[in-house]
Amino acid sequence: MNINLFDFYLPEELIAQRPTDKRDESRLLAVNLSNNTYEDKHFFDIINYLHPGDVLVRNNTKVIPARLLGVKEKTGAHCELLLLKQLDGDNWECLTRPAKSLKVGARVDFGDGKLIAECIKEEDEGLRIFKFIYDGIFLEVLDQLGKMPLPPYIKEQLCGNDRYQTVYAKYEGSAAAPTAGFHFTNELFEKIKEKGIEVIDITLHIGLGTFRPVKVEDTKDHVMHSEVYEITENAANRLNKAKQEKRRIIAIGTTSVRTLEANYSKYGSFKAVKEGTNIFIQPGYNFLAVDAIITNFHLPKSTLIMLVSAFVSALK
């Protein structure tokens, strides 16, 4: 499909720069595809669209302060690393800027020697593999020196990093947040559970696959970057039970959609596994796992807007 089919005008002034005082007071657009109706609500109203027996699936990944600003040891030139994925031990796949100057053997200093990154492999489009050298526990060092990797369309710094996490964030490893979950509060989840709605956690650590721009004219030529996901035995059993009982499976966010669809389409049912996926969902995709989606608005020409377009067209 031509990438321009997913383009639209997005006024910058309509992009919220600050969160609402309360997470669930954000606006909600409820779309019923069976009768083409739209309702303008607040997010706390979402409970009225959920039924007893429904299953909500949420991505419990936690964002790490993955943006590092440092200087090259030899030249003192400034550079930036965005940690995307831990490979093994202290080796990480990173997006770099500027990329051309960071060759194999280059060393970058963050925080006066507290954290050193040495480039050990060059990949395409600004990707590099770095080995990190430090004392202590890596995530604790990262907490001291790293910054939260806010999307480029957010111009203002957050007053607290907790607002760039979901209330159910648990397992550290993401370079971006599963933002559809921002609007849920612990109190709202309690009400949801009291109504007889099941909540199941899965994990997908968000990296380049989710937010990498599409740079090709034909979407079939776009290659998704692999991201690691995990479905536990308990989660797989509960999901399969819900599927057998024909209960609705509702994914919170596109990363939950991709996790569920990647797993179910590969194995024919939900299977407990930890592995990578580069599933790319665009119009024409046959949804097997998910019955409804809770999602934010998305940027033009993004793989995320393609996923939502695929879901809408599949149900029409």
Report residues per predicted region.
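Surface-exposed, charge/polar-rich loops and edge strands
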Residues: 1-316
